[in-house]
């Protein structure tokens, strides 16, 4: 199979996009785990105490909120740049 066939195969493109999304999600989970572990875990034990559990829950929620805010902001920036470039070409 030649590379042009790969570039135009919609099923392959969809598969690649799905795998890329999975990879990005795994990277996000890894990053979130690392950040929250460093922030909340004083010393590993046989089970989490309530303070540590609350810290993890809050950390994960803030991490998700922050990630969503950044994604929304990037989308707004891209839309405004697209609208700006369209007005420049008219």
Swiss-Prot record:
Residue ranges of the motif Twin CX3C motif: 36-59
Gene Ontology CC: mitochondrial inner membrane
Alphabetic keyword roster: Chaperone, Disulfide bond, Membrane, Metal-binding, Mitochondrion, Mitochondrion inner membrane, Protein transport, Translocation, Transport, Zinc
GO MF entry, a single one: metal ion binding
Gene3D superfamilies named among the record's database cross-references: Mitochondrial import inner membrane translocase subunit tim13 like domains
Disulfide bonds: 36-59, 40-55
Lineage top rank: taxon: Eukaryota
Role of this protein: Mitochondrial intermembrane chaperone that participates in the import and insertion of some multi-pass transmembrane proteins into the mitochondrial inner membrane. Also required for the transfer of beta-barrel precursors from the TOM complex to the sorting and assembly machinery (SAM complex) of the outer membrane. Acts as a chaperone-like protein that protects the hydrophobic precursors from aggregation and guide them through the mitochondrial intermembrane space.
Protein name: Mitochondrial import inner membrane translocase subunit Tim8 A
Organism: Danio rerio (Zebrafish)
Top-level taxonomy: Eukaryota, Metazoa, Chordata, Craniata, Vertebrata
């Amino acid at each position: 199979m030649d590379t042009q066939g790969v570039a135009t195969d919609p099923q392959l493109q969809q598969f690649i996009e799905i795998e890329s999304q999975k990879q990005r999600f795994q990277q996000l989970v890894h990053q979130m785990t690392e950040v929250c572990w460093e922030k909340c875990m004083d010393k590993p034990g046989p089970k989490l105490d309530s303070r540590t559990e609350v810290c993890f829950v809050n950390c994960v929620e803030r991490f998700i909120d922050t990630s969503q805010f950044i994604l929304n902001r990037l989308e707004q920036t891209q839309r405004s740049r697209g609208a700006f470039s369209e007005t420049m070409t008219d």
